[in-house]
Amino acid sequence: FQHRHRRPAVTEVRRGALPETAWAEEAGLRYRLDFQRGQNLGFFADMAPGRAWLRERAEGKRVLNLFSFTCAFSVAALAGGAHSVVNIDLSRPALALGRENQNANGFADARVHYLPHNVFRSWKKLHALGRYDLIVADPPSAQKGSFLVERDYPKVLARLSKLLAPEAELLLCLNAPWLPADWLREQAAERLPGDRMSGFTLPLSLKLLSAQPVSVFPEL
């Protein structure tokens, strides 16, 4: 159980013990879970449709993964045959877990960059690495000192056009239930005029793997 009302959030084991190593499995790919991270385990199961969307389009593409966290989108892109991937996130531990995910899925030799940088201070660096055929933006809704969705997401959108290759596609994600359903669509339409937009819902599908059997929701 996670006590998210506490600061910092506390995870309480009600019965048994947490496995030292556990993996989520989705569409034949494996993603490392870290129960010591606090309230985020390193993998967001609700973004399965986004990863499937990216994987279907990734063959031969140059992919930019903004706010990459543990690089689950990167793994999906590589599984789809991406030419190269650039992951950028402030958290070095998250990127290290992302590299572990890449290696665990057999992509150790893939063309992947891991940039432990602030996105807002890295636009020139990202541009120097080339233009991108697919860009994923899945920022935190609120991260103290670095990102507030209402203030900062529009700034990200305004920068994307200079990074896009011809016929590029974007996957723009938002987890901010306090905002209107059309907020992101409206922001994108204003800053990326002329682009077609569509959306999809997020069903949940997750299998937990570990060295020992684990009851995700044991009887109490």
Predicted segments with their positions:
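Non-catalytic substrate-recognition/targeting regions of SAM-dependent transferases
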Residues: 1-44, 52
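Conserved class I S-adenosyl-L-methionine
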Residues: 60-69
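Conserved SAM-binding loop of SAM-dependent methyltransferases across substrates and taxa
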Residues: 70-82
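Conserved SAM-binding motif I beta-strand of class I
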Residues: 84-89
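S-adenosyl-L-methionine
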Residues: 90-136
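Short strand-turn motif at the edge of the Rossmann-like AdoMet-binding core
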Residues: 139-140, 146, 173-177
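A short glycine-rich, Lys/Arg-flanked "PGG" loop and its adjoining helix->strand segment in the class I
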Residues: 152-166
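C-terminal catalytic and target-recognition region of SAM-dependent MTase-like enzymes
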Residues: 169-220
